């Protein structure tokens, strides 16, 4: 699974961004739960999900700031 590019995320609507943020937070919770219960977890999934979450939160913040000034 390759890391997501910002140009791909910029094409999403505001609602899709919010939905994806919620989904990633749930996936991260599930991964942490699996790790805590000693189930098999691929460590790179944490990195990929945190990276995409940071990108989405940045995008959401950029849109919020630009919308408030215009």
Swiss-Prot record:
Q: Which GO terms describe its biological process?
A: translation
Q: Report the SS bond pairs.
A: none
Question: InterPro entries from the xrefs?
Answer: Ribosomal_protein_uL29, Ribosomal_uL29, Ribosomal_uL29_CS, Ribosomal_uL29_sf
Q: Which superkingdom does the taxonomy of this entry point to?
A: Bacteria
List GO terms (cellular component aspect): cytosolic large ribosomal subunit
Give the record's keywords alphabetically.
Ribonucleoprotein, Ribosomal protein
- What family is this protein classified in? Belongs to the universal ribosomal protein uL29 family.
HAMAP family, from UniProt?
Ribosomal_uL29
Name-wise, this protein is: Large ribosomal subunit protein uL29
Gene coding for it: rpmC
């Amino acid at each position: 699974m390759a890391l997501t590019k910002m140009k791909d995320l910029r094409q999403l609507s505001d609602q899709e961004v919010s939905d994806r943020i919620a989904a990633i937070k749930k996936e991260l919770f599930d991964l942490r739960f699996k790790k805590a219960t000693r189930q098999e977890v691929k460590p790179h999934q944490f990195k990929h999900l945190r990276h995409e979450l940071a990108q989405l939160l940045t995008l959401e913040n950029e849109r919020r700031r630009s919308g408030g000034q215009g």
